């Protein structure tokens, strides 16, 4: 293997095969999808899609992982005989391309063309290290060796777009062209098509298109969709708090973000705590104005209990001009958010009058709304986070554990007071009870801190637990003890108090991102109060319809369903308009563009007719018989919404009928596959829009979500070099190795792992399999013929039937790792076991050919290039394997499967017994057990079988037989059966602990077996004859154990036992039981001859 490990020959052979097969597919146009006049019956067609990717770079393995799921599913249905449509489009809407192009333009203006960056301007990205492999060492083409990458750019650091473009392999002269956004649209989509063709995507490329107004047909489609939603009252203009990019000057939706996808605005009540005059010297410039410490709180109802305010001593603050008369003291970050919410003298521009630190604020006397204390003071708190809220915190020690412990630290530690210049008279003298909470009383924070033995404000874990215990209960069960709402529930009066504070001018509404959000342009986002167009997701009646649709869909996992249900529970109005970027203009308000998650919720319908517009030209559709301006609302209504025939249209009636037929045939969408992160936006929008615009019969049928992909168990990141484009992966591992590895990476919604070791092993395994098939077929005349008759023949054929059924189920459930296990790994193991079992008799000709046929077809969805090559060139079959049909199979014989497992397990057991007897079992000797050592040499195996359970095992089986529910195929809880078993065995003097230790594993094993193969598993005998199975395979046992001879005997027959002679004692030491034979290994002279 040493020379082979340095060779690329195996990988190169797969690449050659793929090129050959790709040419066949192109010549035969195998993925062309045509509708029929008659509507399809269930199962006759399969229409699936993948969210079209952004075209601001090459496709990578992350794209390929999600895409592989829909590709495998489509290929499976194609193999089963369905008419399959899998289209693929390219998304260019929104900010990603525009932001990148603008970055290039700025870099050229600042640093020249090509730009000259200084050493300080750039940060080197570690080079990709070549992966090691025990099988094949392959080169890594196109290593990313540039500066900091796009992933690094997402962190918001100084990363140059020019260097990112260089990492794509572009020259400086080429890069300059990308300052124009249109260059991206024409450069990357054709490269993506190349990569996807090499990958083997089963796509009808006639239907491909790009978004934005560069494609006038799609532009017309989106305009119709938006007008339709507006006419239905589902698009409105409103002022709402929205995540906003100051640099871009517009809202920043999920797909416009580098980090923070899914983050929503968090609303606070901003309490205005007025600074009591006279002002200290530091605040002198603010004379003549009302100055407030502005504290953001989620609990306005607790303001009655304020004892002080908190500031961070080392924190940086500012006095910001909110209006002509009012000044707020808070952090710069909070001031910026307020400026975008119309709380700044200069809109969107915070005006700082005085820069301050927390030290400057300590000791300020304050009047705070609702507080029982007329004057409270600003005191130091060491755990305040200035990236959350305003940096000013209200203190309510009766109900906030953090406040209670910080106050205790100050009161009990004079040194801390001295350090920060805190005067004794500033410290509150008592805690004010304001809320009674069952379990915690009227000073919940004090009680929980004492209960948890919290020592200081720095005990973060215990304080977090204290908050968890008290906060929710305070809201749901708390009762007010003070003020005009005395005796009323907190959850009732909280919104009332909030409204009252705002109406009296003692507080305002303040909002900020609940977590940091970075735009793709590189700035940190704020929350802005914007006046723009919104889609009314979350509206009660619309939500009910969306929930109805969801309830009927196949979502393939409970986690996915829970994710959608949660999203539907909170999703509200969505800003659908943007001021900058690429896309379609809002038709009634053309100063705005349709944002990228709003033009991508219904385009699956566009795919059904896209080939009539484009026919391979993904841009303007130069070959089309239709002009874009002919696609008016009346035509779209007719095609997609059961509207009347558009009599005024000058589109030929035959073309209109063809488009209508295409949509009616392919819709509804059978499957959409995506990463789980799109549940919270795109996929839910997809459901909402279909339920609003489509008839019930055309609602989507299924969504399958997956997790993210890791490379070699590490997060995929170009900045660390742990990254692969799809093109790189194909060059490195071949398309076949890449696809195999993607299937093996994982099912479900958890993160999966693309392991290079697996891809390399796939290359080795598949090329070896190809060689084996060719070698077998070269000598097929020497293979055994006639009816398959041996035990090994029957087992092998049964294993193929089992693999067919399990693989079919896995593909149907979109469990592709499971399909690979059942349809490849397990099938390979069955073939290897068959080859070993056949011995001198040889393998059967027909069974081997059936195996090659079955193996080839089962791997079609995952490795189509390999499968089609084997089908045509190795097996000499007619036609293309992609549509060859699912292999026929017989009903699997589960008893035979169980018998073969018994045989294999018995051989393993016998091997252990042989090793034990040959060694004299030192372990057994130490324990004083009698062990007979056998001299080395030619040995004979005496295998003893007890075919019927007795004793406590028989008791267990009788109980299981009586308690098995055949309708539900289930048993009652173990505790019930153990009680029944104990009642019987305790009467016989058995110890209860001994019963549990010995019986429970046996009970569990037999329960599982019964659920798997039926009640026959509960018989006192196994569902097959053990002696018969072992007798039929004596030669296999002999060869596997290296024995001269093997005989099978019954342990219940005294004559058989006597044959063991002096070694019969071993049957007492290790008595056989059903499923567990005992073997004695002797020389031929040390046994008694049969009588």
UniProtKB/Swiss-Prot annotation:
Motif ('HIGH' region): 53-63
Gene Ontology CC entries for this record: chloroplast; cytosol; plasmodesma
Compartmental location: Cytoplasm, Cytosol
CDD domains in the cross-refs: Anticodon_Ia_Leu_AEc
Cross-referenced InterPro entries: aa-tRNA-synth_I_CS (IPR001412), aa-tRNA-synth_Ia (IPR002300), Leu-tRNA-synth_Ia_arc/euk (IPR004493), M/V/L/I-tRNA-synth_anticd-bd (IPR013155), RBD_LARS1 (IPR055416), Rossmann-like_a/b/a_fold (IPR014729), tRNAsynth_Ia_anticodon-bd (IPR009080), Val/Leu/Ile-tRNA-synth_edit (IPR009008)
Catalysed reactions, semicolon-separated: tRNA(Leu) + L-leucine + ATP = L-leucyl-tRNA(Leu) + AMP + diphosphate
One function term, GO molecular function aspect: ATP binding
SUPFAM superfamilies, alphabetized: Anticodon-binding domain of a subclass of class I aminoacyl-tRNA synthetases (SSF47323), Nucleotidylyl transferase (SSF52374), ValRS/IleRS/LeuRS editing domain (SSF50677)
GO biological process: leucyl-tRNA aminoacylation; post-embryonic development; reproductive structure development
Record's keyword terms, sorted: Aminoacyl-tRNA synthetase, ATP-binding, Cytoplasm, Ligase, Nucleotide-binding, Protein biosynthesis
EC number(s) reported in the record: 6.1.1.4
Family: Belongs to the class-I aminoacyl-tRNA synthetase family.
Name listed for the protein in its UniProt record: Leucine--tRNA ligase, cytoplasmic
């Amino acid at each position: 293997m040493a020379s082979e490990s340095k060779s690329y020959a195996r990988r190169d052979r797969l690449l050659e095969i793929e090129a050959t097969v790709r040419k066949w597919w192109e010549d035969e146009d195998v993925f062309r999808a045509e509708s029929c006049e008659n509507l399809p019956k269930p199962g006759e067609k399969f229409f699936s899609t993948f969210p079209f990717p952004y075209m601001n770079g090459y496709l990578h393995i992350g794209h390929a992982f999600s895409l592989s799921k829909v590709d495998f599913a489509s290929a499976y249905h194609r193999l089963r005989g369905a008419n399959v449509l899998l289209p693929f489009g390219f998304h260019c809407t929104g900010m990603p391309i525009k932001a990148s192009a603008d970055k290039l333009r700025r870099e050229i203006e600042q640093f020249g063309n090509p730009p000259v960056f200084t050493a300080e301007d750039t940060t080197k990205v570690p080079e990709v290290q070549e992966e090691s492999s025990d099988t094949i060492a392959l080169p890594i083409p196109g290593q990313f060796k540039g500066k900091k990458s796009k992933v690094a750019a997402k962190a918001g650091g100084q990363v140059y777009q020019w260097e990112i473009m260089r990492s794509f392999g572009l020259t400086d002269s080429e890069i300059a062209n990308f300052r124009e956004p249109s260059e991206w649209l024409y450069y990357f989509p054709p490269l993506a098509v190349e990569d996807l063709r090499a990958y083997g995507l089963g796509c009808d490329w006639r239907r491909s298109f790009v978004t934005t107004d560069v494609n006038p047909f799609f532009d017309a489609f989106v305009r119709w969709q938006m007008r339709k939603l507006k006419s239905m009252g589902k698009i409105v203009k409103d002022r709402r708090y929205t995540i906003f990019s100051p640099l871009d000057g517009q809202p920043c939706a999920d797909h416009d973000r580098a980090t923070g996808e899914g983050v929503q605005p968090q609303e606070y009540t901003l309490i205005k705590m007025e600074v009591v005059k006279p002002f200290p010297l530091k605040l002198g410039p603010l004379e003549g104005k009302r100055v407030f410490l502005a504290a953001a709180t989620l609990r306005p109802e607790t303001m009655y209990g304020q004892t002080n305010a908190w500031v961070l001593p080392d924190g940086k603050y500012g006095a910001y001009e909110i209006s002509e008369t009012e000044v707020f003291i808070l952090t710069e970050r909070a001031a910026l958010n307020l400026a975008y919410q119309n709380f700044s003298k200069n809109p969107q521009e915070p005006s700082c009058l005085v820069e301050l630190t927390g030290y400057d604020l300590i000791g300020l006397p304050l009047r705070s709304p609702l507080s029982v204390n007329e004057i409270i003071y600003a005191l130091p708190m060491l755990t305040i986070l200035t990236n959350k809220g305003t940096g000013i915190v209200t203190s309510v020690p009766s109900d906030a554990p953090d406040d209670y412990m910080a106050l205790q630290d100050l009161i009990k530690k004079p040194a801390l007071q001295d350090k920060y210049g805190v005067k004794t008279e500033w410290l509150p003298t008592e805690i004010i009870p304001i809320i009674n909470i069952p379990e915690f009383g009227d000073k919940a924070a004090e009680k929980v801190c004492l209960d948890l033995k919290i020592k200081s404000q720095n005990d973060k874990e215990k304080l977090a637990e204290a908050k968890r215990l008290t906060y929710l209960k305070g809201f749901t069960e708390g009762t007010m003890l003070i003020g005009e709402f005395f005796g009323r529930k907190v959850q009732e009066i909280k919104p009332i108090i909030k409204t009252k504070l705002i109406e009296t001018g003692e507080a305002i509404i303040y909002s900020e991102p609940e977590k940091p959000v970075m735009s793709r342009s590189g700035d940190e986002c704020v929350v802005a109060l914007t006046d723009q167009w919104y889609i009314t997701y979350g509206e009660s009646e619309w939500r009910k319809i969306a929930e109805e649709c969801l309830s009927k869909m196949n979502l393939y996992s409970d986690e996915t369903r829970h994710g959608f249900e949660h999203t539907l529970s909170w999703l509200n109005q969505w800003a659908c308009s943007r001021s900058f970027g690429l896309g379609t203009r809002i038709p009634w308000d053309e100063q705005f563009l349709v944002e990228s998650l709003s033009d991508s919720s219904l385009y699956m319908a566009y795919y059904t007719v896209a080939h009539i517009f484009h026919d391979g030209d993904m841009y303007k559709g130069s070959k089309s018989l239709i002009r874009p301006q002919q696609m008016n609302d009346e035509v779209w209504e007719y095609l997609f919404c059961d509207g009347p025939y558009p009599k005024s249209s000058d589109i030929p009636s035959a073309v209109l009928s063809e488009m209508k037929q295409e949509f009616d045939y392919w819709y509804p969408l059978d499957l959409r596959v995506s990463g789980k992160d799109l549940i919270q936006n795109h996929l839910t929008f997809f459901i909402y829009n279909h339920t609003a615009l489509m008839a019930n019969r055309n609602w989507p049928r299924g969504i399958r979500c997956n997790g993210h992909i890791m490379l070699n168990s590490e997060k995929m990141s170009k900045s660390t070099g742990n990254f692969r484009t799809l093109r790189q992966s194909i060059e490195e591992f071949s398309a076949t190795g890449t696809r195999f590895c993607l299937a093996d990476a994982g099912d479900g919604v958890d993160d999966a792992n693309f392991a290079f070791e697996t891809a390399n092993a796939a290359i080795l395994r598949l090329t070896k399999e190809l060689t084996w098939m060719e070698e077998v077929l070269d000598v097929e005349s020497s293979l055994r013929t006639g009816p398959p008759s041996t035990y090994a023949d029957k087992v092998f054929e049964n294993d193929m039937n089992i693999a067919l059924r399990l693989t079919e189920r896995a593909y149907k459930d979109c469990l592709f790792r499971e399909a690979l296990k059942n349809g490849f790994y397990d099938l390979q193991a069955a073939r290897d076991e068959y080859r070993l079992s056949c011995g001198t008799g040889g393998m059967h000709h027909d069974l081997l050919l059936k195996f090659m046929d079955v193996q080839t077809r089962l791997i079609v969805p995952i490795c189509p290039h390999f499968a089609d090559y084997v089908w045509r060139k190795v097996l000499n079959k007619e036609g293309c394997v992609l549509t060859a049909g699912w292999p026929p199979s017989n009903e699997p014989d589960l008893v035979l499967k169980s018998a073969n497992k018994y045989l294999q397990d018995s051989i393993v057991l016998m091997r252990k017994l042989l090793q034990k007897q040959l060694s004299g079992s030192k372990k057994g000797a130490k324990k004083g057990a009698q062990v007979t050592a056998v001299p080395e040499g030619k040995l004979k195996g005496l295998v003893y079988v007890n075919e019927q359970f007795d004793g406590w095992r028989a008791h267990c089986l009788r109980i299981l037989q009586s308690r098995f529910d055949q309708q539900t195929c289930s048993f009652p809880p173990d505790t019930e059966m153990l009680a029944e078993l104990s009642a019987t065995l305790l009467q016989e003097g058995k110890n209860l602990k001994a019963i549990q230790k010995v019986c429970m594993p046996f009970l569990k094993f037999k329960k599982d077996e019964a659920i798997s193969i039926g009640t026959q598993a509960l018989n006192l005998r196994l569902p097959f004859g053990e002696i018969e199975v072992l007798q039929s395979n004596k030669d296999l046992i002999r060869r596997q154990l290296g024995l001269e001879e093997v005989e099978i005997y019954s342990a219940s027959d005294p004559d058989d036992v006597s044959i063991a002679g002096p070694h019969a004692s071993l049957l007492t030491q290790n008595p056989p039981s059903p499923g567990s034979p005992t073997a004695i290994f002797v020389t031929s002279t040390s046994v008694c001859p049969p009588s």
